[in-house]
Amino acid sequence: MTALENIKKEFITNLLINQNKGVENIQKNLYSYEDYENLLQSAYEVIKNNPDDDITSIRKKMYETSGINEAVNHLIYEMEMAPSLSISYGTKNYQEVINAGKVNQINTSENSIYDLASISKLFTSISILKLASENIIDLSKDITYYDERFHNLKGVTLLSLLTFNTPLITKGRIDEKDISYEESKNRLYNIMVNENFLSTANPYTDLGAMVLKEVISKVTNQNFYDFVKENIIDKANMQKTSIFVNPQDLSYLAPTDNTIVYKNGEFIFRNIPLGTVNDEKAQILGQQANDFAGHAGLFSTSENMAKFAISLMKYDILSEKYLKSMSKNATGRFIEELNSYKQFFGQLCYSKNPNPKATEVYHPLSGTSFAMGGYTGNQFTLDPENNVFAFLGSNRTNNRVANISGFDKSKIKHFPSGKETILIGNKEYINSSTYSSKRDEALRCTLKLSLSYLFLEYYVNTLENEIDLTGTYSRHI
């Protein structure tokens, strides 16, 4: 057995161990030794067949065999699922960005700005966990212990909201048309436990994060965005991450305007001015109040989100104990009557779902990996055990049909390229409602490549070669 083969065996053994860290039995052993061997086969062949190549050349050849170009081309140029896309990915040492499409007639780049939508929840989760790690709050205590304004939530703990374990409901929508800021806030403070919520239903909600945001502000006596900026954004040097986009940067902002949704038997066109967040609750309780709403409302770039990932992996923002607790399954289980799994959530994030078609967290990653998606077309995955990550930014809601719940799907026009359109009036619009499943191939290719780069780093370090493994690379296709 060659040195390379021995190193590959050691590396795969580590991956096998790491996939079972921090997970329940139902989430264990989702990948076998053979699965990992197949996953790394291309990377192994590149290293084996190019012994005299430098690190840059080997990484380039790994990229060329990764399938990323084909997956991104199919998603953006053939299916036209979004006007633009920017994916940052890699290891703690080395990061790449792949860009496709255009933002405001300019080629997408690592500086293109995206509406993070629900990925913003990760900043709320990390904020509450930071306070817990400093013994400022106790996650087992009731919401009302820290904030009596939520008088209907007696008996509801911080942890239960952090883990989507308490269904909530408000008297009237927080984002009702023409609602005032004061009334929207009042409805939030009068939030109640939804006693009629089905135990088999998906427990995902924005409301828990919105309540936790208020608790953090109350406990710290600080505007929530200011807290997040001080404790996360500035620490990670994320200079392009904010609740507002600077006027001079608007040309870099990927628009989400003309978001089309099917509701009550008709298509509704949502006008969203450039610089306004897509989420209406985040508009009212976030931007209009010069604050971060907690569930959505942040803008960022793929380059900034790479900085976010690296800072997390270095434990600059949150301790190892609390970071690796985020992925712990709190909701997932098999439901006999539905013959399927209830969605697996951790702490305002996804945990591994054993069903490979339903999981938001890529199965080859460690058990401490977590992920979160965003309505506007984004996804963030972090593996703090193996130290790899990926952020996918896009604007799939721009001039596209984003939601067709209740629509007659037989009226969708299908093209050989995979593109889908819907006729509204006299004009055909691209259907991007299935974007989250269609983008998975591109996302998983980047995570697979990140693991390949990690294998390369492990190989170099094991041989004790004095090679600089750090660096960045960006490309547009």
Positions of predicted regions on the chain:
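Short, contiguous, well-ordered secondary-structure segments
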Residues: 1, 188-201, 212-216, 416-419, ...
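Catalytic loop of the DD-peptidase/beta-lactamase superfamily, centered on the K-T-G motif
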Residues: 4-99, 229, 270-477
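Mature, folded catalytic cores of secreted/periplasmic enzymes
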Residues: 72-73, 77, 87-101, 132, ...
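Short, surface-exposed loop or secondary-structure junction motifs
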Residues: 155-364
